[in-house]
């Protein structure tokens, strides 16, 4: 059975693992998922990630991050553009998340970028998700 929305699966697995207070979560590998996870790492929402290229398929391991009170750093991971309803934005209309306190992740012609970097580069694209 094929997966309809692998990005939604990534976000849901991270959300569920954080609610269960897991240290790591393992996902099926894809280049887009790695780019999204790299952005989460750069922005300080997760500790890091690693890729395991073993047979029969590669996996992506995400190392989750918690506050000292064991509360997850990520409060909300929300999918914006979905397979049934794609959401695109121009460079001038990229929305702020929580007045600039959160980030949105876009798929652009320059690759997967945060909303802030997309504004700086002057490119628009598909809004994949919001994180705060």
Where are the regions that the model predicts?
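Core subunits and conserved enzymes of cellular information-processing
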Residues: 1-132
């Amino acid at each position: 059975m094929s997966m309809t929305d692998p990005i939604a699966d990534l976000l849901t697995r991270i959300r569920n693992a954080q609610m269960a207070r897991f240290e790591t979560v393992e996902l099926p590998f894809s280049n887009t998922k790695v780019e999204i996870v790299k952005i989460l790492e750069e922005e300080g929402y997760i500790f890091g990630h690693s890729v395991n290229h073993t047979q029969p398929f590669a996996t992506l391991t995400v190392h989750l991050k918690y506050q000292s009170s064991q509360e997850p750093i990520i409060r909300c991971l929300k999918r914006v553009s979905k397979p049934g309803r794609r959401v695109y934005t121009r460079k001038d209309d990229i929305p702020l998340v929580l007045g600039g306190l959160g980030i949105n992740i876009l798929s652009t012609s320059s690759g997967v970028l945060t909303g802030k970097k997309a504004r700086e580069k002057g490119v628009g694209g598909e809004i994949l998700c919001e994180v705060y």
